[in-house]
Amino acid sequence: MHLNNINSILFLGIGGIGMSALAKYFIAKGINVYGYDKTPSEMTDALTDLGAKITFIDDAKCTENVFDLVVYTPAMPKDSFLLNYYQQSTIPLIKRSQALGLITKNSFTIAVSGSHGKTTVSSMIAFLLKECGIDCSAFLGGVSVNFNSNYIQGKSDVVVVEADEFDRSFMTLSPNLIVLTSIDTDHLDIYGTRENIVTSFLEFLNKLDDIGILIHNEKVIDEILIRGKKRIYGFQIGDYKATSLKIYPTHSTFSINDSEEVFKLNYNGRHNIENALAAISVGLTMGIA
């Protein structure tokens, strides 16, 4: 499927954080965006202000419009009238993750994966890239404080995305660089066992080709076997180690690999240093930080 010929698009569950980021992308492209959600919210209000036409009634009235594509979130109820209608329609119907995969297919994709920290690390990477002169785009799983949005529009071919393991959504992506923060026992309702979770992550990591790069936390070192290059970050071992840590009530400072350069972070706690280290590791690996 190609997105170049789309003039109108319907989002089922448009108020969700991931769906609304996609909607903002298409609005910025000048495409007519329509949406359904169960209830109004700050996000649907913001999308309406941008030009989206949104309904909160799950009935046939919405189907009076003709759409080139319908995108839905897996969170849509199975008995939704609109979801069932478009499942039986000839109009292309795809999941949110599939739409994200199509959008980023021909970009240099930095995919942030892991059980924790994806939104924070993705936001930090996008901010770092922008500050270093790379006008990236980003699809975030939360509203970034620095950008006041969950979608960041850029002019370069670099895009930062969250690679969500839920429902194996990350398998739709074509990553060039992957950040892996952690692998924990989450989503057992989908995967059943930790072994299945690890297997799914490894399948995603192996979507990297021979020149792809994986940057991962030292905590998951025993579970990683992939093609391409690897860089490790953490506190004890690896290519990028946080050293000289100082944690204060309102901020933290640290260096990398015992260098004289000191990084100041406006948050305290080792986990925030770890997130910042992941983002800086991307910059160092790309030769921009």
Predicted regions and their residues:
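Gly/Ser/Thr-rich beta-alpha loop segments that engage phosphate groups in nucleotides
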Residues: G15-S20, D37, H116, V143-S144, ...
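Pocket-edge structural micro-motifs
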Residues: G13, F56, G114, E162-A163, ...
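N-terminal leader/targeting and accessory segments in enzymes
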Residues: M1-K95, A99, K241-K246, N268
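Phosphate-binding loop of NTP-binding sites
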Residues: Y25-I31, T48, K61-T63, P74-H216, ...
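Adenine nucleotide phosphate-binding catalytic loops in nucleotide-utilizing enzymes
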Residues: N4-S8, L12, L47, Y191-V198, ...
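Short aromatic/hydrophobic contact patches that present stacked aromatics
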Residues: L69-V71, T109-A111, K264
